């Protein structure tokens, strides 16, 4: 459990740092930083699932700290949900629908790409 907590702390710290940097770099009415972080997390989880778990390269003791802890706290469903509701409340329906559609489609594609990369990795 301590490993999951440590992974969670690192993932939250990484999300905050990357999110702050992306927000300053890419100011927009669309929640692009949240989308980018969630897609990166989906790619990482796809890779870890394929390489670390399915191919057995990640020791059992590291699985939960990496997946549930780090990647789980790095990605954020709650922030994505709030971002979407705020767009709806502001009457920005097209942006809200784009956020939902793009997040789902690109997130699933990122998991798929992560797994494909994992199975091609030769180490």
Swiss-Prot record:
Q: Which UniProt keywords apply?
A: Cell membrane, Ion channel, Ion transport, Membrane, Metal-binding, Sodium, Transmembrane, Transmembrane helix, Transport
Role this protein plays: Fluoride-specific ion channel. Important for reducing fluoride concentration in the cell, thus reducing its toxicity.
- UniProt-listed NCBIfam families: crcB (TIGR00494)
Bilayer topology = Multi-pass membrane protein
Family note: Belongs to the fluoride channel Fluc/FEX (TC 1.A.43) family.
**GO biological processes:** cellular detoxification of fluoride
Q: At the top level of its lineage, which domain of life is listed? A: Bacteria
Binding residues annotated for Na(+), in chain numbering: 72, 75
Task: Write down the PANTHER family for this protein, in alphabetical order.
Answer: FLUORIDE EXPORT PROTEIN 1-RELATED
Gene Ontology MF term list:
fluoride channel activity; metal ion binding
Q: Which reaction does it catalyse?
A: fluoride(in) = fluoride(out)
Q: What is this protein called?
A: Fluoride-specific ion channel FluC 2
Q: Which compartments does it reside in?
A: Cell membrane
The family database entries (InterPro entries) matched by this protein are listed as: FluC
Residue ranges of the TM segments: 30-50, 68-88, 93-113
Q: How is its activity regulated?
A: Na(+) is not transported, but it plays an essential structural role and its presence is essential for fluoride channel function.
């Amino acid at each position: 459990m301590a490993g999951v907590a440590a992974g969670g702390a690192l993932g939250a710290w990484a999300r905050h740092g990357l999110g702050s940097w992306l927000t300053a770099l890419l100011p927009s009415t669309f929640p692009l930083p949240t989308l980018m972080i969630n897609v990166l997390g989906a790619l990482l989880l796809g890779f870890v699932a394929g390489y670390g778990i399915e191919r057995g390269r990640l020791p059992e003791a590291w699985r939960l700290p990496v997946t549930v802890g780090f990647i789980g706290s790095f990605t954020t469903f709650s922030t994505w949900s709030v971002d979407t509701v705020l767009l709806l409340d502001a009457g920005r329906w097209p942006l809200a629908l784009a956020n939902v559609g793009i997040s789902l489609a690109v997130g699933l594609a990122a998991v798929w790409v992560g797994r494909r990369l994992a199975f091609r990795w030769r180490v």
